């Protein structure tokens, strides 16, 4: 009888021990906020291997891992019902999280999302060959660049979603994004290089010199000055906040009049090209 009770006690002790190790709660852990609105639970005590236990729930999936540090950094892993593997990597300074989904082999990427502390993020989706097919870059201010139909050479379709309207264009193999707006004979092109540098150009197919528009880009002020027959008519400023403002020149084309007005619709941008 004593042996029986001893056996039962040992089993219960092992179960309790397993529960303590496998599950974290508010009593035995600390919650740490991560970029992207995620949270990770960090055990208050080290395990038998001298590691801190980590737990997080992302998209209703429970992820677990261990870390040498108790600040929330480390790597957590899990498995979805379709056997695909999930990995969450938290930077040592908690400034960045990398959330990856792999196929069942644990090597072929399905998707990857990197989120920074300023709420900006880059999300990539991959095709069956493990090549990038879609990419979305969200800036800290909420505006974003969306890339779809990405081919093996890196080219594809592009879209910039601003605060109030959207610009569409293409992604070149060299990483250059070109977004275009057409109004009559005038084409406005916003170019975003792989480095993030922005340039803006204006082309007019009008053959009449007296009405033909030209544009001059000033990278220092991010301003496109539009002229007609060599006389300045208006300035378009592409601000750091990813907004566009327009301000007209006087009839002589020498001084700016009034105040710069923010463009809030695609129609207003097209009107500025008239």
From Swiss-Prot:
<comment type="similarity">
    <text>Belongs to the OspA lipoprotein family.</text>
</comment>
<keyword id="KW-0472">Membrane</keyword>
<feature type="lipid moiety-binding region" description="S-diacylglycerol cysteine">
    <location>
        <position position="17"/>
    </location>
</feature>
<feature type="lipid moiety-binding region" description="N-palmitoyl cysteine">
    <location>
        <position position="17"/>
    </location>
</feature>
<dbReference type="InterPro" id="IPR001809">
    <property type="entry name" value="OM_lipoprot_Borrelia"/>
</dbReference>
<dbReference type="InterPro" id="IPR023322">
    <property type="entry name" value="OM_lipoprot_dom_sf"/>
</dbReference>
<dbReference type="GO" id="GO:0009986">
    <property type="term" value="C:cell surface"/>
</dbReference>
<keyword id="KW-0564">Palmitate</keyword>
<dbReference type="GO" id="GO:0009279">
    <property type="term" value="C:cell outer membrane"/>
</dbReference>
<keyword id="KW-0998">Cell outer membrane</keyword>
<keyword id="KW-0449">Lipoprotein</keyword>
<keyword id="KW-0614">Plasmid</keyword>
<dbReference type="Pfam" id="PF00820">
    <property type="entry name" value="Lipoprotein_1"/>
</dbReference>
<protein>
    <recommendedName>
        <fullName>Outer surface protein A</fullName>
    </recommendedName>
</protein>
<keyword id="KW-0732">Signal</keyword>
<feature type="signal peptide">
    <location>
        <begin position="1"/>
        <end position="16"/>
    </location>
</feature>
